[in-house]
Amino acid sequence: MSEYSESVQFIDLKAQQELIRQKLDTAIANVLDHGQYIMGPEVKSFESDLREFTGAKYALTCANGTDALSLVLMAWDIGPGDAVFVPSFTYVASAEAPAQLGATPFFVDVCEHSFNIDPISLKQAIADCRKTGLKPRVVVVVDLFGQPADIDSISDLARSEGIKILVDGAQSFGGTSKGRPVGSLGDATTTSFFPAKPLGCYGDGGAIFTSCDEDSEIINSLRLHGKGSQKYDNVRIGMNSRLDTLQAAILIEKLKLFPRELALRAEAAQRYNSLLQDKCQVPILDKDHTSAWAQYTLVLPDRDKIQSALKASSVPSVVYYPIPLSNQTGYKQYPKVSSGTLTSERLSRQVLSLPMHPYLEFLNQQKIADLVVRNL
């Protein structure tokens, strides 16, 4: 095969920036001209765009995706004595947020094909939890790698148990479940605008989506130090968590490009599938789901060998995530489902994420797939 058509990037922010650089420069210059760097007009404009994109009644931006999780849990008065169910196979923020509030993360296993929370494991965890004296309050439904979880099955279970659903859409913003956009699922949804996310800014940022009037009012107060109707009358303990105006201005322009980029990501994923699906375990989408394709992740019994081969050919790859949360030093003290988290543990040994972005060239995908297949 010929040489790579370009240096392979795991995530190519430069290619995107080149497409809209003039628009970004103008948007940033406008903020510099008006000088409202905190909660300027672009923040409200971007929140309006997010509401339109998701169909949520409210969209409230904040400083980052982790704060978004914390703000929702704070609005729901989650704290000591409360159990928050979290998949063991995910990024730490999903468990960090409840733990910081004094609640107990309760770890649940995931489905092998989707990497998302397993409703059967969740049902067992709720039963286990009730025996401990903890109060089951919330399930954090993480949409890992871009695909929404089985929200209907989880919703049926959660409703029957009186448990709220917090969708962690940090990786799935732009995806859909049965035609419903991420942002309109669960009691509340959060997302992250970290630069590497499908919709990312050039710093940190996050957002919360809800259709509950009361939750929206409380979250708006919490993100601004717990302020009341008067600026210096703080009616609750809050935090300082705001999306700055420059990032909002950037995100307004990037959101305009986002639908096209989602389509390009889906095309790139389909090309990978056509090259690899007969050779190894590729990502499987649930029926009537679309993915934001934050990552393209294989399950490979000899993962380390293949990653080494890719590295030797200057092809980047990443393991998301090498240690289940329930096994990590800071979190193994917390309870996990009695049936165990065996799928999470095995996936941590076998997953490998390949380069994925909207501007990935087919020639490079062919070379990457060839390296994977030759080293199986």
Model-flagged regions — what are they?
Residues 1-36, 41:
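N-terminal "arm"/small-domain region of PLP-dependent enzymes with the aminotransferase-like
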Residues 102:
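Structured binding elements
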Residues 113-201, 207-209, 353:
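Active-site phosphate-binding strand-loop segment of PLP-dependent enzymes
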Residues 35-83, 97-99, 107-109, 131, ...:
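Phosphate-binding glycine-rich loop
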Residues 88, 107-111, 321:
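Short beta->alpha connector loops at strand-helix junctions that form conserved
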Residues 2-3, 14, 26, 43-48, ...:
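PLP-dependent aminotransferase class I/II
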Residues 19, 78, 136, 265:
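Pyridoxal 5′-phosphate
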